[in-house]
């Protein structure tokens, strides 16, 4: 019997076996006609989605049939909800989440590992998950980085918030070049009878890098920054150089014209920890200690390197502002692979910068920065036997360089006009400049501006770069601008002949590879000291970028190059009236991403320098002129 009396009312029972007549008859029954209620079985029968077979999850029937009590409520003793366990998309690995509770009712099923909740197998378009398409719910395996993968931070390795990332990368660079190459007439020459100071300009340089990076981090994988990160990345390099003049691979002419080297190191390693949350909008402050990459401005005009440092960084005002404070204790670089060793460099660099997004115009970012370079006095020969500190010119005595850079840079767009700019002023002191033969005070400046417009698939670019030169080598003020370790992505970047090639002049380099500055530094910029007695440069660029397809881009550039002043060069080579014209740099490059991502990148370029009067005066033969110089390269990056 019922425990209490109720008024007669219609019981809203669910349909049984989708029979409408059954539903009508049940709705007409009055509760007062029953003295008791018999409990009925509660079967669970999954049925297919009849309206869309094979698409979407199955439609489940109600697991209860006519088992309401007379108050219209479910019974207390319900059968547990049963369901199909579908595998998650991608490669998930084994879950490390140990269940802490079991199912106790049909209303709630514990799913403690929220990352591995499966979905029905679904071939959305009936095309068997093509490899190059963005296809949902694709099955994965451990060797496929394009679907969700435990090794690519898509699923936690430990618990709910600790992830592992494995990166395996290969980079292969082949570089053919023609640059002025001095002969060795007093020792020996590979070609008897050579009379000119500069001989065969041809050379081939090959670099192969293998990187294996392991990263463990703790976080939520959305907008929230990581709580902590640990990363280590060993790198192996092999390199090969072939030239046609002696004294290039080594000062010892007996070393020949070919050189093959290898080097292995722990290139990147650091520990990162979040110190504080600065706002409810995921603003944070973190610290990172160890060997880490860092570029100090938008285009790498002053500093771009990977070395040992302690960095304090974070965001403010809903990520509208960003800041960095970083102190580098530089390690020595391997001469031929440019990788870090574990030997101290004797150079300390401090950098502070602050970014403000949407400055004046939406999409326009401004940056203020400060750099300080303390390069201590030392005597250093590189692994090929070349003197790199101090410069092997003039008074080659160890000296200390202290330089402070003050900079302001912008990057972004103003309406449809893309704009990048930078201005820097450097001041400091060199205790004994080898060329000036005396201590000098540093006072130099530089500026850069790039404007571009992209109405469609073509981007039109115009840019200019200026670095002041020194017009009096005999005073005690050095006004030639030099960077710390630059790698500018500007005016053609790595596709440009002038920027990509290293051009020697007597015992130094007129300019270093991956640099715009003719700074007369020794050997390479990683091991030598900054030199502020240099001719400076004026560069004007016109370029066009063509987005041929979603996968392929064509980059073309034309650079007009001039020394700012040639007074330093005239004293350096004991030659009067050197013109300022360096020449015209023409380049054409292609960049392809066949898989529409960074797992496979191919770059190739061809470039040439049409020498101007100033270049002819420095490198011209006894009779005739310097021929046009050409270079070509290929660069293949593969990553997992």
Predicted features, each with a name:
Residues 594-640:
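Predominantly the C-terminal beta-signal and adjacent terminal strand-loop region
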